[in-house]
From Swiss-Prot:
Disulfide bonds join 1-7. It is found in: Secreted. The modification Proline amide is found at residue 32. Causes a rapid but short-lived drop in the level of calcium and phosphate in blood by promoting the incorporation of those ions in the bones. GO terms for cellular component: extracellular region. Pfam families: Calc_CGRP_IAPP (PF00214). Calcitonin 1 is less active than calcitonins 1 or 2. Only this species of salmon possesses calcitonin 3. Belongs to the calcitonin family. The keyword Disulfide bond applies. GO terms for molecular function: hormone activity. It comes from Oncorhynchus kisutch. This is Calcitonin-3.
Length: 32
């Protein structure tokens, strides 16, 4: 990655998107 901040932000957003799309089975009220 060229920019660490941008790369981390992208990874974070991707992870958040995955968490939001996945069914809430293991994560109770962890995701808003």
């Amino acid at each position: 990655c060229s920019n660490l901040s941008t790369c981390m932000l992208g990874k974070l957003s991707q992870d958040l998107h995955k968490l939001q799309t996945f069914p809430r089975t293991n994560t109770g009220a962890g995701v808003p």
